């Protein structure tokens, strides 16, 4: 059984000026999503809702460490009902590491150095999450 699930992406937007990194976690039951894909009344309970507190700890730990290592703008931790995270049988987050539609971020995403910093930020975030979980379960 998995302890956590991360889905790692490079984002895209209509505007080439969109930039930064963001982390999505499952929307809590009874609330609208903070992304435009989930608005409009989908307030259903999903499999991953039972991990709401753990999802929040994971999302914030990954986002804060990704920011430190990437040096990019903070788009925040947001809530969404993306299928890949809402069906996860464990704490889960979807990480957006930059925008391929932004010329500067596309250039960065093509470099091994930036991808290594992003990877290290995510690893540091997972380690921070594990520390938080171990403290919470003492």
Give each language-model segment a name:
Residues 1-138:
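Active-site-proximal helix/loop segments of hydrolytic enzymes
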């Amino acid at each position: 059984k998995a302890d956590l699930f991360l889905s790692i992406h490079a984002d895209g937007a209509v505007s080439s000026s969109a930039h930064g990194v963001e982390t999505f976690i499952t929307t809590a039951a009874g609330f609208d999503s903070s992304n435009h894909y989930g608005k409009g009344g989908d307030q259903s309970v999903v499999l991953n809702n039972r991990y709401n507190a753990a999802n929040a700890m994971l999302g914030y730990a990954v986002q804060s460490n990704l920011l430190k290592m990437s040096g990019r703008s903070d788009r925040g931790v947001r809530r969404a009902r993306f299928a890949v995270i809402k069906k996860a049988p464990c704490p889960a987050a979807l990480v957006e590491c930059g925008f391929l539609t932004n010329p500067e971020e596309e250039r960065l995403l093509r470099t091994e150095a930036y991808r290594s910093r992003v990877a290290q930020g995510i690893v540091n975030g997972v380690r921070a999450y594990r520390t938080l979980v171990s403290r919470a379960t003492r």
